Amino acid sequence: AVATMADLAPCDIVVEAIVENLEAKRSLFKHLEEVVRDDCLLVSNTSSLSITAIAAACRLPERCGGFHFFSPVPLMKVVEVIDGVRGAAWVGECLTALARRMGHTPVRAQDTPGFIVNHAGRAYLTEALRIVGEGICAFHDVDRIMRAAAGFRLGPFELLDLTGLDVSHPVMESIYEQYYQEPRYRPSPIARQRLAAGLLGRKSGHGFYAYPDGRQQWPEPPPVPA
């Protein structure tokens, strides 16, 4: 652990995982360049933002790359390795080797909105929110069906609660805007309203589910008609 930015000076690689906001990340990378050596890799854990755009704020954009882990990191072994337009080939190669040394499975991805997983998996969250918004069924029924019938370890609303709407909703908005407001990526007003209400998920103690004592509480099933 470090106490100040200056403590990062001897590092060979710095992985950023701050708020999913382009300007915040660009500002941080610019500051990091004033601290670390010129051969230090500056890497972002962004799940949706352009590595090229983040690196553009840097004096040495060729040493920047993307290194996107999935939550929970100890269980989710895939990590996306992303090359920016001006990124040097050796950066991606170093990140690929590092991921393997960490026991993860690296996958090289192009610098496109959402990369691979958050692009391919958009429908898992957005369609689940749309189903609930249209009144087709309750959110916990969607989760139960996706776990029992489709074999997912987490239903979409459990996943939203685990990640936190303060992370998930900005990612939805980012991908929607980066694809020029493609309708199939449109975020849900349900997520926006719950984010405004502070119902973030596990981290706030209440999201789609309640978490008394940190444990997920499933809604009571409706009574069976006599």
Question: PLM features: what roles do these ranges have?
Answer:
Residues 1-3, 65-66, 108, 210:
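Structural signal for conserved beta-strand scaffold positions within catalytic alpha/beta enzyme cores
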Residues 1-42, 49:
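Rossmann-like NAD(P)-binding element
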Residues 10, 38-39, 61-63, 140-141:
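Short acidic capping loops at alpha-helix termini that bridge into adjacent secondary structure
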Residues 32, 54-55, 171:
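Hydrophobic packing residues within well-ordered alpha-helices of enzyme cores
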Residues 41-111, 115-119:
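Rossmann-fold dinucleotide-binding core
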Residues 100-111, 133-134, 139-226:
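NAD(P)-dependent Rossmann-like dehydrogenase/reductase catalytic/cofactor-binding core
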Residues 120-136:
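Flexible helical/loop "lid" subdomain adjacent to adenine-nucleotide binding pockets
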